[in-house]
Amino acid sequence: MSKNNSTVIKMDEQVLKYKEDLYEKTVHHLKVTIPKKIAEYQELAKSYGQNSENEQDGQTSKKRKLDSEDYVLMPIEDLIKTNRVIMETHQKFKKAYIELIETFSVIRGWISLNIPRIEDGNNFGVDVQEDIITQITKLEEVYTSLLDGSESYFASRASLVKKILKHKDIEAYRYSLAQVDEKEFTRFSFSYFDLANNYATTYSLIVKNFAKLETPRPTNASNIY
């Protein structure tokens, strides 16, 4: 083969098909999935803050009425039980974090495959693509870390319960346990707000720059709407 001849490799049809599938899923997420999630988590954050009367918040409110004195008077067999509402809410957050990671990984995958070949000249659209990929990657890392650290509450509570069982006369451990549980309920409210906020800010960034993400070099780009 002559040194002047270069090998031409065309994009495989399966890869193009996969890219098109990611594009369709991306548009669906931007038009349906993400706006729905923003509204859902906004409402959940509000209901936790206002102690609304729905079933979940009714249970939560009931549990939150237990102040530090209740923990001091509570029988040991009840004290060592993990709060059922907290356990159930942890499972809901785990599901929510996984859904967020999956949703934005699809969008990140499509943007990555849609980056054009490297050329001299105007690469502003490509820079936008790379910046948004970076933002999405950071968001995924945040929620991956939250998944990994979700057991920290249970570990802290278990440690305090062990101390309570060993030192039944020291009320300070019971007060500490009350604070750990109350702190977890408070964190839930902020966590729902953070989910809504992170969905909204990332969604806004993507939609505002969608023309450059879809067609990074030509100026006659289309819009998802």
UniProtKB/Swiss-Prot annotation:
Identification of the protein by name: Proteasome activator 28
Role noted for this protein: Subunit of the 11S REG (also called PA28) proteasome regulator, a doughnut-shaped homoheptamer which associates with the proteasome. 11S REG-gamma activates preferentially the trypsin-like catalytic subunit of the proteasome. May also be involved in cell cycle regulation.
Bilayer-spanning residue ranges: none
Domain of life: Eukaryota
Subcellular localization: Nucleus
GO MF assignments: endopeptidase activator activity
Family membership noted in the UniProt record: Belongs to the PA28 family.
Organism from which the protein derives: Dictyostelium discoideum (Social amoeba)
Subunit (UniProt): Homoheptamer. The homoheptamer associates with the 20S proteasome.
Main location: nucleus
Gene Ontology terms: biological process: protein catabolic process; regulation of G1/S transition of mitotic cell cycle; regulation of proteasomal protein catabolic process
PANTHER family assigned: LD45860P (PTHR10660:SF2), PROTEASOME REGULATOR PA28 (PTHR10660)
Keywords tagged on the record: Nucleus, Proteasome
Entry GO CC: cytoplasm; nucleoplasm; nucleus; proteasome activator complex; protein-containing complex
